[in-house]
């Protein structure tokens, strides 16, 4: 029986990448040692890091105007790093909130800098949506504008990119990076924890415009200092080498399978399959307006919530793993990142249909 992992993160990895990692685990490149045992400053590992960055630059069309950093701390580490690096005296950092993670970013930034929070959601009788970007009412002056294009808990995705005449645009793309094509030049800093579309947890990708590195910001730990990490080649201290290795393998897999354009087409097909089933069911429901629905994270509710435990238990028995919703919102959630095949979503839909028939 095939098993499909719908966990929000750490998430499913491409089976081909997992198999290659297994084959190379104790003997990488014929060197007789694991990549986990290699010096991060060895010529072999340095070659891997260069290959990894070049692959990501090709996948996302990242120009030389940006540095690409591989940092510790995941997304939450960047919640601290962004204000520490980009703070400006007598200016407020604007945080556009559309769910749990964007609110968490605001809360962390409040420890270091002045913030202005803007709720960019609509709530119409319990149905949530994202306001048009033109209606966000961003202030005329700000140290930076921060937003999260995809909220994994709430299942809300923002497809348009905000702009500002003077303030840099910062995006937490932890759950949407590499899932759809974007124009990197519309942003000044993009960060992403790896554990959804890139690899295992333990590393964060930061794509930062070089001109931003000149900002003094606030006193900060070296491992959160963008300018220092750029100068040191992301090796101010020992990096998470195995996570970096697996990120390189995932990037190679993406390039071999049509790149971001192909991933986007597949992700649209997967999301449409699942949402269409939910919308045409009187047993399940979703609380997000169609134009604001996440392609990566699909929360849904059983109309009879007394069946929740039974649904989770039987879905696990059917090889459909980690479907229980986030504790904050309840219900169910299917996270369908790049590595999730269409067959996995079809298996979920088939199970949901059978469960509804059995329990109606």
Swiss-Prot record:
Subunit structure: Homodimer.
Protein name: Phosphoserine aminotransferase
Cofactor: binding details: Binds 1 pyridoxal phosphate per subunit.
Main location: cytoplasm
Gene field: serC
BP-aspect Gene Ontology terms: L-serine biosynthetic process; pyridoxine biosynthetic process
Matches recorded under SUPFAM superfamilies: PLP-dependent transferases
Subcellular localization, as worded in the UniProt entry: Cytoplasm
